[in-house]
């Protein structure tokens, strides 16, 4: 029997161990997509206890706790922090096969030096030990980031945000660069009830009137310029339905006007406006040499009762299953026709789309850019061991694994950075298996360089 999560965790061959310990393990982290709060980084917040640092916004954990039957009071409610923690400890003890189990114990090991498995029986011991360390200066938010050698992290930000935290952090002596990401979902999703209110908010931020779809593009262009001045290198879009129908500017303007006047819109009209906006944004991204991320197929807020109670992003989203390959190909081609397609990263929440996305990425290449269109890492419901193995196998079978930009956390927790380690171990194990099965030569120096590139260097080259 192998030891529990020891130094060679997930590394099944000698080649895998060599690649991880001599290459992947030492590399810094470029976390190009997360949902961390920049205000907490600026303030260098000190987390009060394990409950606050673990359960303060992590819907992965909330879903697992709900599956265990715990009351919402113990999850997102006003119950005592220790009682919430005990419920989480019991949840983790029961979470065999779930990535939460591995993530939680990697976090305990890497940040706190705790190797005891978390359970209801060990909860008090681990609570006391970890909380004592959380009160020291080594465990402020900034030190949690530096602990894992994070060189860059990209938060997720609305175009109307003032980015005061990012701008203030640029003036401070903090070794990690905290960069904003441009996420204009609220400008794109005109079917949302609060769209008219958001138009007013964005217009105020851009200091210009927004009375048409073309005005919206100009306002977003203005805000993108501001984001670029704050160090932005990447945009992000959530695409949840029909997102591209070719149309003229006049047609997009008509759809916008109809929406602002309270009219009902067809799915085609939604696709026309969204396609017009996304295409014009893509052209701007290409002009400014920033990457465009497309996160596709989240089916959000399925429990309307819980959405009314808790709001969005609280654990009631799942995978969608609509067909979108022709639409995606046409959207990317629209920009590529003018040789103005930006660097693009494709993700789908439904793993059934993996071969399609990997093959789609290969349609659009450019001299001097390695894998200009990337098949993105296993995302959200897929960032577990088997999901990552599947994504890596699909990418290597259809595309070029060596040019892959690697992992991200997509997390709201400052303890989430060991997810990069989790990915790197899985990567090294996959390559190690190929080598030891005689499917690739044991050229360890070349392979170590490849692993270093996938772990960090490729992302630096791609985004910077």
Where is each model-derived feature located?
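Short glycine/proline- and charge-enriched loop/turn segments
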Residues: 307-315
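Hard-cation-handling environments
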Residues: 298, 303
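Short, basic/hydrophobic alpha-helical segments
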Residues: 331-337
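Divalent-cation-assisted or electrostatically stabilized phosphate/pyrophosphate-binding catalytic cores
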Residues: 324-328
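C-terminal amphipathic alpha-helical interaction region
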Residues: 292-294
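Metal-cofactor-binding active-site regions of metalloenzymes
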Residues: 1-288, 340-342, 346-358, 362-464
């Amino acid at each position: 029997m192998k030891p529990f999560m020891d130094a060679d965790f997930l590394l099944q061959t000698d080649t895998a161990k060599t690649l991880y310990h001599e290459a992947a393990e030492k590399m810094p982290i470029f976390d190009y997509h997360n949902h961390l709060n920049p205000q907490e980084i600026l303030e260098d917040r000190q987390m009060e206890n394990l409950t606050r640092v673990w359960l303060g916004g992590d819907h992965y954990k909330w879903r697992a706790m709900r599956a265990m039957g715990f009351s919402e009071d113990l999850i997102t409610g006003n119950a005592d922090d220790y009682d919430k923690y005990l419920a989480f400890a019991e949840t983790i003890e029961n979470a065999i096969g779930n990535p939460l189990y591995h993530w939680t114990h990697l976090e305990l090991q890497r940040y706190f030096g705790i190797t005891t498995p978390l359970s209801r029986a060990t909860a008090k011991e681990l609570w006391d030990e970890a909380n004592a360390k959380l009160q020291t200066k080594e465990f402020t938010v900034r030190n949690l980031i530096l602990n894992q050698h994070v060189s860059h992290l990209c938060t997720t930000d609305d175009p109307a945000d003032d980015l005061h935290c990012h701008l203030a952090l640029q003036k401070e002596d903090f070794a990690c660069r905290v960069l904003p990401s441009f996420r204009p979902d609220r400008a794109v999703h005109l079917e949302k009830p609060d769209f008219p209110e958001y138009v007013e908010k964005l217009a105020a931020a851009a200091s210009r009137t927004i009375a048409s779809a073309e005005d919206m593009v100009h306002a977003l262009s203005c805000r993108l310029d501001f984001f670029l001045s704050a160090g932005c290198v990447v945009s992000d879009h959530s695409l949840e339905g029909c997102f591209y129908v070719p149309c003229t500017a006049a047609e997009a303007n008509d759809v916008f006007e109809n929406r602002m006047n309270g009219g009902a819109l067809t799915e085609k009209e939604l696709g026309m406006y969204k396609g017009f906006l996304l295409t014009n944004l893509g052209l701007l991204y290409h002009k400014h040499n920033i990457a465009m991320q497309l996160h596709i197929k989240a089916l959000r807020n399925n429990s309307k009762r819980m959405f009314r109670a808790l709001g969005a992003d609280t654990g009631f989203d799942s995978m969608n299953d609509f067909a979108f390959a022709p639409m995606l190909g046409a959207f990317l081609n629209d920009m590529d026709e003018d040789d103005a397609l930006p660097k693009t990263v494709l993700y789908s929440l439904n793993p059934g789309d993996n071969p399609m996305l990997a093959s789609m990425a290969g349609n659009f290449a450019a001299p001097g850019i390695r894998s200009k269109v990337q098949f993105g890492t296993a995302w959200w419901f897929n960032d577990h061991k088997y999901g990552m193995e599947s994504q890596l196998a699909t990418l290597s079978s259809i595309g070029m694994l060596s040019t892959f930009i690697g992992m991200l956390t997509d997390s709201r927790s400052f303890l989430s950075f060991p997810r990069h380690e989790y990915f790197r171990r899985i990567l090294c194990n996959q390559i190690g298996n190929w080598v030891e099965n005689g499917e690739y030569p044991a050229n360890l120096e070349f392979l170590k360089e490849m692993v270093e590139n996938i772990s960090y260097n490729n992302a630096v080259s791609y985004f910077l």
